[in-house]
Amino acid sequence: MDHKPLLQERPPAYNLEAGQGEFACAPHGYGAIAAAPPPPYPYLVTGIPTHHPRVYNIHSRNVTRYPANSIVVVGGCPVCRVGVLEDSFTFLGIFLAIVLFPFGFICCFALRKRRCPNCGANFT
């Protein structure tokens, strides 16, 4: 086996000052934070109005309040407030779902009818 001689020298120190050692260091003060930024340039405002009138639009809404003891059923009939609306698909919606297979389902769900079984009211 071939044994290579080990390095007997020590590595260079880590705390070298600028200009010492065999590596080139940056000039003194490089990367230091400046004392103060230069003053800003003054600018002149000529002919531009500084005050703009503000316009506030105030809208009022009519809020319908229900009595505290009323129960609102999701999907309930707004006419009789007793029945629950049932969905049914129209003939045209089913036809388009078959003919335009992947995209026809959008038409099928867009063309459905909702009907109340209690009062018979139809909603589209």
Swiss-Prot record:
Interacts with BRI3BP. Interacts with MGAT1 and IFITM3. It is a multi-pass membrane protein. It is found in: Lysosome membrane; Cytoplasm, Perinuclear region. This is Membrane protein BRI3. It comes from Bos taurus (Bovine). Keywords: Cytoplasm, Lysosome, Membrane, Transmembrane, Transmembrane helix. GO terms for cellular component: lysosomal membrane; perinuclear region of cytoplasm. Belongs to the BRI3 family. The chain crosses the membrane at residues 66-85, 91-111. PANTHER family: BRAIN PROTEIN I3 (PTHR13551), MEMBRANE PROTEIN BRI3 (PTHR13551:SF1). Participates in tumor necrosis factor-alpha (TNF)-induced cell death. May be a target of Wnt/beta-catenin signaling in the liver.
